Regions:
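Short aromatic-glycine-(Arg/Gly/Cys) micro-motifs in beta-strand/loop hairpins
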Residues: 9-12, 20, 76-96
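Mixed-charge, glycine-accented linear interaction segment located at domain edges/termini
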Residues: 90-120
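Contiguous mid-protein beta-loop-alpha structural module that forms a pocket-lining wall or clamp
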Residues: 1-3
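Negatively charged, low-complexity tracts enriched in Asp/Glu with abundant Ser/Thr
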Residues: 5-61
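Short linear motifs in intrinsically disordered
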Residues: 50-56, 73-84
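Short, solvent-exposed secondary-structure boundary motifs
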Residues: 40-45, 66-72
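Short amphipathic beta-strand/extended segments with alternating polar/hydrophobic composition
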Residues: 72-80, 98-105
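Secondary-structure transition/turn motif
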Residues: 64-69, 92-96
Length: 122
Protein backbone atom coordinates (compact mmCIF):
# COMPACT_ATOMS: atom_id res chain seq x y z
CA UNK A 1 0.00 0.00 0.00
CA UNK A 2 1.35 3.39 -1.03
CA UNK A 3 1.18 6.31 1.35
CA UNK A 4 -0.46 9.59 0.30
CA UNK A 5 -2.66 8.06 -2.42
CA UNK A 6 -5.75 7.39 -0.36
CA UNK A 7 -8.95 7.76 -2.42
CA UNK A 8 -12.01 7.44 -0.15
CA UNK A 9 -14.48 6.86 -2.99
CA UNK A 10 -12.30 4.52 -4.92
CA UNK A 11 -10.66 4.96 -8.30
CA UNK A 12 -12.88 6.18 -11.12
CA UNK A 13 -15.64 7.54 -8.90
CA UNK A 14 -16.59 11.20 -8.97
CA UNK A 15 -16.94 13.04 -5.69
CA UNK A 16 -19.28 16.03 -5.43
CA UNK A 17 -17.42 19.28 -4.97
CA UNK A 18 -19.03 21.52 -2.37
CA UNK A 19 -19.62 24.80 -4.17
CA UNK A 20 -20.83 28.14 -2.97
CA UNK A 21 -24.35 29.29 -3.67
CA UNK A 22 -25.10 32.38 -5.68
CA UNK A 23 -23.85 35.59 -4.07
CA UNK A 24 -26.90 37.47 -5.28
CA UNK A 25 -30.03 36.99 -7.32
CA UNK A 26 -30.35 39.01 -10.53
CA UNK A 27 -32.62 39.50 -13.51
CA UNK A 28 -31.93 37.67 -16.76
CA UNK A 29 -31.72 39.82 -19.87
CA UNK A 30 -35.24 39.01 -21.25
CA UNK A 31 -36.77 39.64 -17.81
CA UNK A 32 -35.03 42.99 -17.42
CA UNK A 33 -35.95 43.99 -20.99
CA UNK A 34 -39.63 43.29 -20.26
CA UNK A 35 -39.53 45.27 -17.00
CA UNK A 36 -37.67 48.22 -18.56
CA UNK A 37 -40.07 48.22 -21.52
CA UNK A 38 -42.99 48.68 -19.11
CA UNK A 39 -40.99 51.30 -17.19
CA UNK A 40 -40.30 53.28 -20.39
CA UNK A 41 -43.96 53.28 -21.37
CA UNK A 42 -44.99 54.37 -17.86
CA UNK A 43 -42.44 57.22 -18.03
CA UNK A 44 -43.86 58.28 -21.41
CA UNK A 45 -47.36 58.30 -19.86
CA UNK A 46 -46.09 60.49 -17.00
CA UNK A 47 -46.74 57.87 -14.29
CA UNK A 48 -43.16 57.06 -13.28
CA UNK A 49 -39.99 59.15 -13.20
CA UNK A 50 -37.35 57.11 -11.40
CA UNK A 51 -36.43 53.52 -10.56
CA UNK A 52 -34.16 51.54 -8.29
CA UNK A 53 -32.87 47.99 -8.35
CA UNK A 54 -31.70 45.91 -5.42
CA UNK A 55 -29.97 42.53 -5.60
CA UNK A 56 -29.62 40.34 -2.50
CA UNK A 57 -28.97 36.67 -1.81
CA UNK A 58 -32.72 36.02 -1.56
CA UNK A 59 -34.30 38.28 -4.19
CA UNK A 60 -33.87 40.79 -6.99
CA UNK A 61 -36.12 43.85 -6.78
CA UNK A 62 -37.12 46.55 -9.27
CA UNK A 63 -38.94 49.54 -7.76
CA UNK A 64 -40.58 52.35 -9.77
CA UNK A 65 -41.18 55.83 -8.33
CA UNK A 66 -43.25 58.85 -9.33
CA UNK A 67 -40.70 61.01 -7.47
CA UNK A 68 -37.36 59.91 -6.04
CA UNK A 69 -38.26 61.07 -2.51
CA UNK A 70 -41.41 58.90 -2.31
CA UNK A 71 -41.99 55.26 -1.62
CA UNK A 72 -42.21 53.14 -4.78
CA UNK A 73 -45.52 53.06 -6.64
CA UNK A 74 -44.77 49.51 -7.74
CA UNK A 75 -42.19 46.93 -6.80
CA UNK A 76 -41.43 43.78 -8.80
CA UNK A 77 -39.60 41.07 -6.90
CA UNK A 78 -37.96 37.90 -8.20
CA UNK A 79 -37.49 35.34 -5.42
CA UNK A 80 -36.34 31.96 -6.82
CA UNK A 81 -36.89 30.25 -3.44
CA UNK A 82 -40.65 30.54 -4.11
CA UNK A 83 -40.40 29.08 -7.63
CA UNK A 84 -42.07 25.77 -6.70
CA UNK A 85 -44.64 27.31 -4.35
CA UNK A 86 -46.60 30.37 -5.45
CA UNK A 87 -44.23 31.50 -8.19
CA UNK A 88 -41.01 33.47 -8.02
CA UNK A 89 -42.53 36.76 -9.25
CA UNK A 90 -44.42 39.17 -6.98
CA UNK A 91 -45.88 42.59 -7.76
CA UNK A 92 -46.27 44.88 -4.74
CA UNK A 93 -48.34 48.05 -4.66
CA UNK A 94 -47.48 51.44 -3.21
CA UNK A 95 -48.38 50.47 0.36
CA UNK A 96 -46.63 47.08 0.22
CA UNK A 97 -49.73 45.06 -0.57
CA UNK A 98 -49.31 42.05 -2.86
CA UNK A 99 -51.09 42.83 -6.13
CA UNK A 100 -50.14 39.66 -8.00
CA UNK A 101 -47.96 36.55 -7.65
CA UNK A 102 -47.08 34.03 -10.27
CA UNK A 103 -44.69 31.90 -12.25
CA UNK A 104 -44.85 34.04 -15.42
CA UNK A 105 -43.52 37.61 -15.43
CA UNK A 106 -45.97 38.76 -18.14
CA UNK A 107 -48.97 37.69 -16.04
CA UNK A 108 -47.56 39.35 -12.93
CA UNK A 109 -47.05 42.63 -14.83
CA UNK A 110 -50.63 42.56 -16.20
CA UNK A 111 -52.10 44.90 -13.52
CA UNK A 112 -49.46 47.51 -14.39
CA UNK A 113 -50.22 47.08 -18.11
CA UNK A 114 -53.93 47.74 -17.40
CA UNK A 115 -52.98 50.78 -15.33
CA UNK A 116 -50.91 52.05 -18.25
CA UNK A 117 -53.87 51.68 -20.62
CA UNK A 118 -56.06 53.71 -18.25
CA UNK A 119 -53.38 56.42 -17.96
CA UNK A 120 -53.03 56.67 -21.74
CA UNK A 121 -56.82 56.86 -22.26
CA UNK A 122 -57.16 59.80 -19.84
Amino acid sequence: MKTGTHTPAGPGQVLPFPGRGADQIGFERPELMRILDLYGRMVAAGEWRDYAMDFTRQAATFAAFRRAAERPQARIEKCPALRNKQGMWTLFGEHGQVLKRGHDLANVLAPMERRLLKAVEE
